[in-house]
Amino acid sequence: MIGTVCIAAAVLGLCAQVRRSLERNRLFRRDLAGGRVRIAPLYNQGAGFEALPLSARQMAPLSLAALWALLCRWGFRGVGAGLLLGGGLSNLWERLRHGRVLDYLRVPKAPGMLKRSTYTLAALAFFLGAALLVLRRRRR
């Protein structure tokens, strides 16, 4: 459980630092990895890729309930739980602190919908954590 909390804290801290750095550098845009990854900052006030037009205060209890339900279902231990918890709390913190999330990662050469969306490290940590939890559960 301590490892899970440490991973979650590391994700939360890293995501906060990246946001701070992007805002200090005036939301610069640039390509990385030969154009396979693009830094393209975009403020997101909604949720679920802006499919849910809810305010930060409306999203907070929903986010906490969803995190709690996922962790109760899949477990509170391990790397997957730490990544899921850290990613979820990072997005929640940004919504409460700033009223919106700063999405900044694009993958222009990815297939389908993946190339049209903009992500954060928090979202990637959340999705990777969820995938690890599902894989761990299937191995049992």
Predicted regions and their residues:
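Alpha-helical transmembrane bundles and membrane-interface segments of multipass inner-membrane proteins
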Residues: 1-140
